[in-house]
């Protein structure tokens, strides 16, 4: 091999190595995801599966098979098991969409081969083994956390005032009160769990930031979305954008599904 050929080969080898390093640390482009026919929706803390009720009809209208997980909200491991059971019922390519706390669930169980894309809606998105609480502490504390009311049994929920003013402030008051009534109570162990893997490193990822979020700091949402190389949209919404901006949320999930 002459000097010119050797230099060309060295350049190509270096480029390939660099590309490989990048591929290992960032998700593939969102537009590379295959077409999905299923969607699994996962709710967060202070909520239940019915919070997706306004999103679901838009997805079904596009021919998607939709399932909404009901999380026990006792431990991360148990919630992940519930999500896995739902994924096991899917018959092929599936988009996994998560709101709020359940972004941690999607990060963990999204490695399932059926999952073709991840959609985070104002959601937590830690790296593998990362202490999310420590990450969130780097940003100003959002107001909703002051409204957490814990019972003698160790389970907690948001007060009605916090729910209406800091969790769902752009939802009609009557609807917000109804949603507050059905919110799941969380155990004092729920937020102690950590992921062991990060599905977003290998799966096309989408993120909807809630610009008016008073439950998760919007700048933290932007940081996580950027770190995941997610295709990001910003919504003029509260934390509960899956209700107040249901059409926009559905459109993002439909885009992730490729239908």
Task: Show where each model-derived region lies.
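N-terminal export signals
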Residues: 5-26
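Post-His helix in hydrolase/transferase enzymes
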Residues: 243-255
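Flexible "cap/lid" loop of the alpha/beta hydrolase fold
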Residues: 114-115, 119-151
